[in-house]
């Protein structure tokens, strides 16, 4: 099985797992009913420093981060950080713009121990759910089909904060979310192992 097929299988498992753990059905709510959403501003790559307050630039979410992270690869000085949107532990950072539909709403869950900051073209989702569960859900076909109704643009695709808040998401009980995350994490670990093996074979 190819790595991409494995990833798609893992994401498709969310619906199966919800059906398994919630046989009587699962409550679905607009994202805005379970979270507060905030639009970022400012922050350019030229603002990065070697140390300071951790930051995640929206462009890095496409290329440098996966489903979740507890460390940032970039920093800004405190003076600038004070002007930027704060990201609390357990928040999601979601891309608001991209050149293609697939990358709009790409999410990374912030699992670090302290606040960081983000900037323009990012939406912070503050909630009381399992952050990794929500971040995984943002990768599903179900979410993709729902977001299409709200993404607009041609050369540059964009979603507004208030429209992202309208997207309906499944909200199983927290213990179910945790079990789903445990299973999907195991898929991700297997995917990482396969990628490492493939790289080793190519270098051999």
Where are these regions (language model features)?
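Amphipathic alpha-helical segments
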Residues: 1-11, 25-27, 165-203
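Non-catalytic DNA-recognition/assembly elements of restriction-modification systems
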Residues: 17-41, 204
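Short, solvent-exposed loop/turn positions at domain surfaces
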Residues: 20, 42-43, 80-81, 111, ...
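A short beta-sheet element
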Residues: 57, 81-141
């Amino acid at each position: 099985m190819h790595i991409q097929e494995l990833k798609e299988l893992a994401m498709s498992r969310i619906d199966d797992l919800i059906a398994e753990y919630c046989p009587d059905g699962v409550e679905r709510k607009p994202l805005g009913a379970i979270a507060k959403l905030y639009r970022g501003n400012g922050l350019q790559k030229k603002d990065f420093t070697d140390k300071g307050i951790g930051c995640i630039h929206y462009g890095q979410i496409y290329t440098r981060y996966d489903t979740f992270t507890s460390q940032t690869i970039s920093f800004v000085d405190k003076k600038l950080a004070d002007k930027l949107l704060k990201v609390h532990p357990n928040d999601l950072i979601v891309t608001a713009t991209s050149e293609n539909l697939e990358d709009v709403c790409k999410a990374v869950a912030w699992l670090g121990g302290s606040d960081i900051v983000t900037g323009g073209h990012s939406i912070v989702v503050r909630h009381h759910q399992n952050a990794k569960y929500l971040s995984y859900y943002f990768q599903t076909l179900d979410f993709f089909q729902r977001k299409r109704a709200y993404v607009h643009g041609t050369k540059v695709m964009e979603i507004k904060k208030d429209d992202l808040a309208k997207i309906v998401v499944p909200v199983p009980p927290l213990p179910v979310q945790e079990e789903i995350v445990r299973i999907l994490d195991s898929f991700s670990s297997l995917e990482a192992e396969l990628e490492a093996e493939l790289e080793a074979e190519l270098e051999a």
